[in-house]
Amino acid sequence: MIFTDYRNVDLTNKSLRTVPVALYAHAEDIKSLTLSRNPMLDIPGDFVQLCTSLQELRLSNMSIKKVPQSVQNFTTLMGLDLSSNRIGDINDIALYRLPDLQELRVQNNRMEKLPWYFPRLHLLRLLNISNNKFQDVPEEVCKMSSLEELDISFNMISQLPEDLQSLQRLKILIIVGNRVTRIPDSFRRLSNLGVLDCRRNNITELGAVSLLPNLEELLVGHNSVQALDVSSGPLLKRIDISHNDVTQISLAPGPVGRIPVGLTYLNVSSAKLSSLDDLALGQLTSLEELTLDRNKFRAIPDSLGELSLLRSFSCSDNLIGALPSSIGRLQRLERLDVHNNNLTEFPTALWNCGSLERINMTSNVIAHIRLPSLPPASAAPPPPTLGFPESALSSTVTLVPCLPDRKASTTGSVAPSSRSLPPLVKSLQRLYLGENRLTDDALPLLMILRELRVLNLSFNDFQELPRQFFKEIVLLEELYLSGNKLAGLPTEDLPRLNKLEVLYLNGNRLLTLPQELGKVINLAVLDVGSNGLRYNISNWEFDWNW
């Protein structure tokens, strides 16, 4: 066995039953030693005495039931990992002999209690006892005043003791997957707590936990909370209260009389919300990600347009019939997901979103794609971002026909000129419009989205693609046209699709495939199933006509 670095020795899964002899001569140089996943039951005492500089020892996944006695003699240890074993208790190992121990990981074991001496571990900052058999928070933990991070997840704990308030240095508390029903009022004294993760419990109310002055992240998903009163502290940035029974969100002023405008992330998906307070939403001006999936919304307030920093907005699986026109003011919006709603048309305001890269409007009832209307003649001229030529604008795109038999000289009038393209044209890369009611009238405006990499138009009512459909969208990597009524493909620009890798044409009315398809050099996936393709075995050089 050859070693190149004696400071950090990793012997994971080497089928070792003892420490290699080659390490003895360099034992004093070892800072970190990993012996995980080996059938080793003990560490030789003479080797331990030679390790005068060891700071980290990892003994995880070794199927041990008892901690090797020699571990307590590594007096310079700062981190000890005993996770994922079969340890029932650590009472017979004197860890208090490790005066510098700062991190102890004993998760994924079979422990029910902690040793009496744990409060004597005066420097211990991190303790992970998750996924054991604790029915209560060990009283020893409440006396460990040096703790900064505590993980007691996936035990059988039903109540948090009031004495946890004594952990004044605690910054991270993780209690995921227990049976806790409430957060004690005494938690307001945990003034240094920055992260509280209490997902997957039975919590019905949060109390004043969000008032903590240093709390930055509050994760309460998969509980039974019915109302969220976010009277937040000054540093709160992230709230995840998904998968609860929330029917109301109130954003009341905090202790210093200010609204929690510092929030950057809010997830209230899979709740029971039917509306949002217009004024309250408009106050969350620092939001960057807002997720409202799987609720009962029929409308989104106009104040959505006040969230000028919003990058991601997801409101899928609701009952929304239209998006507010104010969404066009979200110039930093990059991702929009509103699939499985009741949208009847592509929101015209979206054409003004200059950073939008991904739109998912799958499974709606969209029948139209429209451009914004021109302002009245007496009005001030439109801003540069909406300077469409009059010949390209209409209330619907039906006024701009584009048929396969139209000459090339006339197809150029389908789209606005390159100098007046709406901002969305230059940013949109992924567009998902599958399972809607779009017809051929919607195709001209899709043809100008020249930055598209992924376009999904499956399961609509398209019958014929314009002759120059592929002229501008040559950056396509994936194209989905399944489940339409297409009888052919336009061939003029097919060879220019040199980035196309995935093409789905299944479930159409194709009788033949164009020979030009063979010139799409990077095509890796082609699905033409469930068509009427004819194959002539005698005409092998035209093998495309399957």
Label the predicted regions.
Residues R97-L98, Q102, V106-S232, K237-I249, ...:
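Solenoidal tandem-repeat scaffolds enriched in leucines and small polar residues
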Residues F3-Q55:
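LRR N-terminal entry segment and analogous cap-like coil->beta motifs
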Residues K14, N38, M62, N85, ...:
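Consensus "Asn ladder" position of solenoid repeat domains
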